Amino acid sequence: MASETVSNHQEKALALLQADAEKILRLIKVQMDHLTMPQCPLYEEVLDTQMFGLSREVDFAVRLGLISEEQGKAMLGELERELSALHEAFTNKQQ
């Protein structure tokens, strides 16, 4: 019974983190679709705040043993790659 509860908590934690990551990914995708300026202070502030918040959530879940460190790194890494692609696309548009 206790292992079922732990497993359930782990699944819920991962699902919640993935949902938060998806929100950030959607924000990135909207920016990619419109190629709005990534240097816009509001844009940077929102994404930085969201990414920082998610990184803290991931760290907390890892420390509780709800997700593995590898899962957390993979989740954040995917978002960082998308951000990098956005900046690259915008830079290419400017040239």
From Swiss-Prot:
SUPFAM superfamilies: EF2458-like. HAMAP family: UPF0358. InterPro entries: UPF0358, UPF0358_sf. Belongs to the UPF0358 family. This is UPF0358 protein BCE_3996. It holds the Pfam family DUF1507. It comes from Bacillus cereus (strain ATCC 10987 / NRS 248).
